[in-house]
Amino acid sequence: ITFHPDTDYSSFVGAYKPTTALLPICDELGQPMKIGSTVLHKEQIVYEFVAQSFLQAYVNAWKKYDKDDKQYLVIEEINRGNCAQIFGDLFQLLDRNDYGFSDYPIKADADMKRQLQKAFSGLAIEQSDKINAIYEGKDIVSQVLNGDILLLPNNLYIWATMNTSDQSLFPIDSAFKRRWDWTYMPISNAEKHWVIGVNGNNYDWW
């Protein structure tokens, strides 16, 4: 995902969006209308919760946890968005303990809980006892799979890029900064002295 000034929590995590669904046509009593034994249907606008980049990566990380597979969420141009607004209460999840899990789980709201219950339906984590032991024996994994809380697993990596030369539209506060490991990546020493030919003319490049 690439952040920009209009990026917000709903476009990063998820939100209800209008979509069409084929639904039965009902009469005044709410009963499906039929022609013979065939129920009549028509497309109607309904609202569904649509998971966005963060929630997709979060669910995938837990689904592949027992396979020891890593899940990456890459954010481009993180300093072009209002991070405090975009992350919202997910900000707390960025504090990780020595085992790589979130130090402070957060409670999921009702809409998020329904989405997580649907996504985790039938999922079991074989290493649940090991994870629960990190949290003093609390059944934390069951709370995660039931959608009660959000907690980042240690196989979910969130990477972000920013161009320090750009004039940031939204300053990143120190509380947000300290929850990341920062690495400066210099410009790679690309091959120089290229000559590009265009319409019979040669142009020096780099």
Where are these regions (language model features)?
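C-terminal regulatory/interaction module of P-loop NTP-utilizing enzymes
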Residues: 1-206
